[in-house]
């Protein structure tokens, strides 16, 4: 069901909670969606520039102030011996990539130390399609051992990839019904601010068609 009505974000979340009042599935996800117009610029150069905004955004990850969902699994690619990193789910080098390739393990993130990132180039065809190729923007290429632990802790708290689909849409889960309204609202507002700060004002005004809030099984509300 889709309700094409304009609401402020607070009202939209309250309406979704009311809609799901008698539903026992409290794991239903609250989702925020962004819809961007395909550029109508006649300049090929401008088309490339504007498409680049979303391309760059799609390389980033975002951490919500209020954690929800299952803690992500993290794999570390390294040939070094490291101690005191029991919070890492999988550690290895070529053997680790083999397990990822044959789906023996399915980590949410693959991290690597900066001085070893070159060793992963030959595995780009394996890691790329799975969305596991480490990048600095996603925080999965780590400068040194000193910040490795803090990087793992940040990812474990729930760092979500921003994915832009072929229709120029972004859909991200921002919480579930086990959370209180204030927590959901804080997550939504932090995501809105994050994306707003990474897109030029001129692009948002001309290309951001709508923002909506919905849930796994339920109505959608366009927010203003």
From Swiss-Prot:
Gene Ontology MF term list: RNA binding; structural constituent of ribosome
Gene3D superfamilies the UniProt entry points to: 3.30.190.20, 3.40.50.790
Coiled-coil segments on the chain, per record: none
Compartment(s) of residence: Mitochondrion
Chief location category: mitochondrion
InterPro entries with a match to the protein in the record: Ribosomal_uL1, Ribosomal_uL1-like, Ribosomal_uL1/biogenesis, Ribosomal_uL1_3-a/b-sand, Ribosomal_uL1_CS, Ribosomal_uL1_mit
Highest taxon, organism lineage: Eukaryota
A GO CC term assigned to this protein in UniProt: large ribosomal subunit
Pfam families listed in its UniProt record: Ribosomal_L1
UniProt keyword annotation of Ribonucleoprotein present: yes
UniProt keyword list: Mitochondrion, Ribonucleoprotein, Ribosomal protein
BP GO terms, sorted: translation
SUPFAM superfamilies reported for this sequence: Ribosomal protein L1
Family to which the UniProt record says this protein belongs: Belongs to the universal ribosomal protein uL1 family.
The protein's name: Large ribosomal subunit protein uL1m
Organism: Reclinomonas americana
Gene giving rise to this polypeptide: RPL1
């Amino acid at each position: 069901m889709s309700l094409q009505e304009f609401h402020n974000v607070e009202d939209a979340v309250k309406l979704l909670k009311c809609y799901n009042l008698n539903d026992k599935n409290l794991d239903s996800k609250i989702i925020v969606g962004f819809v961007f117009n395909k550029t109508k610029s006649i300049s090929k150069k401008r088309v490339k520039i504007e498409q680049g905004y979303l391309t760059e955004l799609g390389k980033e990850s975002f951490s919500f102030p209020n954690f929800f969902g299952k803690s992500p699994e993290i794999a570390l690619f390294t040939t070094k011996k490291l101690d005191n990193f029991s919070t890492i789910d999988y550690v290895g080098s070529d053997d680790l990539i083999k397990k990822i390739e044959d789906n023996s393990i399915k980590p949410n993130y693959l991290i690597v130390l900066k001085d070893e990132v070159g060793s992963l180039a030959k595995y780009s065809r394996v890691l790329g399609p799975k969305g596991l190729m480490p990048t600095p923007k996603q925080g999965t290429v780590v400068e040194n051992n000193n910040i490795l632990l803090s990087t793992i802790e940040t990812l474990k708290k729930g760092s979500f990839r921003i994915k832009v689909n072929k229709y120029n849409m972004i859909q991200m889960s921002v919480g579930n019904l086990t959370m209180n309204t204030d927590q959901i609202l804080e997550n939504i507002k932090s995501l809105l601010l994050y994306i707003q700060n990474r897109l030029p004002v001129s692009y948002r005004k001309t290309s951001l068609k709508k923002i909506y809030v919905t849930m796994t099984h339920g109505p959608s509300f366009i927010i203003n």
